[in-house]
Regions:
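Short S/T/G/P-rich N-terminal loop/turn motif that feeds into the first structured element of a domain
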Residues: 1-67, 71-85, 93-108
């Protein structure tokens, strides 16, 4: 994966394959459920998890969505084991995430 910013040449780390995880929950998630999930993760010390580079939460077509960039699939999976009980407890059915290998990230 190459990482580019406007003031330097691309930095390429062939050892690292970042991933994009896109969630479209199967249940109708409210902002209150989302905020409660983050609050519980912070309280337990599980937020921000190692390997999470970006977390973006938004609504699209009236449905709550989350997209994340992770350093590795292994870190994503490890956090998922801690996250799933919290989601279940607050009533969120996350569905199966779409997982995509990242080719490039460009930052300003």
């Amino acid at each position: 994966m190459a990482t580019t910013n406007s003031s330097a040449a691309p930095v390429i780390d062939a050892r690292k394959t970042s991933i994009l995880a896109r969630f479209a929950p199967t249940s109708n998630v409210t902002t209150e459920q989302y905020d409660e999930t983050i609050r519980r993760l912070e309280k337990s010390g599980d937020w921000l998890p190692e390997g999470l580079e970006y977390h973006v939460a938004f609504k699209s077509d009236g449905k709550f969505r989350v997209s994340e960039i992770w350093d590795s699939r292994e870190q994503f999976d490890a956090f998922g084991e801690r996250l799933m009980p919290v989601l279940k407890d607050v009533g969120i059915e996350p569905g199966k995430p779409e997982m995509l290998e990242i080719h490039n990230i460009i930052k300003r």
